[in-house]
Amino acid sequence: MLEFPLINDTSRKIIHIDMDAFFAQVEMRDDPSLKDKPVIIGNDPRKTGGRGVVSTCNYEAKKYGVHSAMSSKEAYERCPNAVFISGNYSHYREVGMQIREIFKCYTDLVEPMSIDEAYLDVTTNKLGIKSAVKVAKLIQYDIWQELHLTCSAGVSYNKFIAKLASDFQKPAGLTVVLPEEAQEFLKKLPIAKFHGVGKKSVERLHDMDIYTGADLLKISEITLIDRFGRFGFDLFRKARGISNSPVKPNRVRKSIGSERTYGKLLYNEDDIKAELTKNAKRVAESAQKAKKVGRIIVIKVRYSDFSTLTKRMTLDKSTQDFDTIDRISHSIFDQLEENSSGVRLLGVTLTGLEDQEGRQLDLDDLA
């Protein structure tokens, strides 16, 4: 029977920090009148003829079922008393850099996953603190004292479990999963909550009657590899709390894009959006093939006079999903000022990339 060794490094101390509803929280901090109000970062559909999409929202808005990538129109229907804010992304980036400076006070092993979340390896740290839990509490305290923002923290021996833990008690939560607790923690977790298991994989796992970590634990390694290829190899280990991916402080930020130049100018909106969809499909397929996900979607439009417009939207969660990339691309285009000039070039880019957690490994890599 095909079997690979199970090597589990439980000696590390990893923290995952995730800011709570970051964009909305910054707006609420800067404008105290927003306190206790549902806040949605996205264009107000009453001002755009129903066009637009939700970038993120605060917890008050989430109570109404509002979530990232939802159309602004639907968000308004669910929560008509919400305050819509178009968003100041350069300001959010500035605040994100301030948060990163706080991380650097504790360790240089910081792997930013996006503007508002990062992994930290504090196995050895600048303050010589042996307890990772104490470091996490100090970071939460520093962020609150210096920036008046809250974050949630997950502490464990690897990135996979630390990421899951940070999402366990939001907002302002701290969840610790020790090596001896990992198996029980994962058993109870719905498979859809496993970081890196996408929507299509969840559906396939459900078809196998796998709904929780406990269900996944019952499936043999060879069966998972047979059904999912390299991803199955990784799933088998994740179910057992095994993930030895290092914190990479120098990870390279890349983007995945698709753009086309048209010899015959595009004037009709339906034609333009059909081409946007083709670009979005190519981007999604490339991201899935590269095992990358991204949080920022950018579109580029060049007109017949060679004037060029680019506009971006940052999402709550990373994606490689075609439907999401396509919908957001169309929404961004709808926000551009009308231009009667023909379109010469269209592009869609996914950036703010990170590795898809649970990325698939070639069996040759294990030789």
From Swiss-Prot:
GO CC annotation terms, alphabetical: cytosol
Pfam families assigned to the protein according to its UniProt record, in alphabetical order: IMS (PF00817), IMS_C (PF11799), IMS_HHH (PF11798)
The keyword Nucleotidyltransferase is assigned to this record: yes
Which cofactors, if any, are listed as required? Mg(2+)
> Which UniProt keywords are given for this protein, alphabetically ordered?
Cytoplasm, DNA damage, DNA repair, DNA replication, DNA-binding, DNA-directed DNA polymerase, Magnesium, Metal-binding, Mutator protein, Nucleotidyltransferase, Transferase
Q: Where is the active site?
A: E117
UmuC domain mapped to chain residues: 14-198
GO terms for biological process, alphabetical:
DNA-templated DNA replication; error-prone translesion synthesis; SOS response
Which reactions fall under this protein's catalytic activity?
DNA(n) + a 2'-deoxyribonucleoside 5'-triphosphate = DNA(n+1) + diphosphate
Cofactor binding mode and count: Binds 2 magnesium ions per subunit.
- Which domain of life does the protein's organism represent? Bacteria
Which residue positions hold the site described Substrate discrimination? F23
Protein's name in the database: DNA polymerase IV
Species this chain originates from: Streptococcus thermophilus (strain ATCC BAA-491 / LMD-9)
